[in-house]
């Protein structure tokens, strides 16, 4: 078996094909505030929900929901840094149910609350 055949075999049997990764990411990122049922994204990729979830995790190292939450937090970080929008508005724009939900998830991923992160950024302290 050649190297290309081995790669194709791994993609077919373990993860998503490159076009499926691109399509899934594009669909999930189209509107971060929208609810993206995994079943619909899977259908666009021509897969069942369970197969899609397993293949997505193999391809990207994380389940689709967790990947989407991280993208939402990244977008919230950008909005916190680049706008003066309220944290509640940012939460809504990024697909969180409310400010409290954003704060819990943001703190779990970033290590500080959105308000503290914003204050520190504006004060010139950089938190990664």
Predicted regions and their residues:
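Terminal helix-turn-helix DNA-binding modules in bacterial transcription factors
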Residues: 22-30, 34-40, 58-97, 119-128
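A short beta-strand-loop micro-motif that forms or neighbors metal/cofactor-
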Residues: 31, 45-47
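Hydrophobic recognition helices of helix-based DNA-binding modules
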Residues: 1-3, 56, 80
């Amino acid at each position: 078996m050649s190297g290309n055949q081995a790669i194709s075999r791994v993609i077919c049997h373990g993860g998503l094909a490159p076009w499926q990764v691109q399509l899934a990411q594009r669909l999930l990122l189209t509107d971060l505030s929208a609810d993206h049922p995994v079943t619909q994204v899977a259908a666009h990729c021509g897969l069942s929900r369970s197969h899609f979830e397993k293949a997505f995790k193999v391809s990207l190292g994380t389940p689709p929901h967790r990947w989407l939450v991280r993208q939402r937090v990244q977008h919230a970080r950008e909005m916190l840094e680049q706008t003066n929008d309220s944290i509640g508005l940012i939460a809504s724009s990024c697909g969180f149910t409310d400010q409290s939900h954003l704060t819990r998830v943001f703190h779990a991923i970033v290590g500080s609350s959105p308000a503290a992160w914003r204050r520190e950024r504006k004060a010139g302290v950089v938190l990664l």
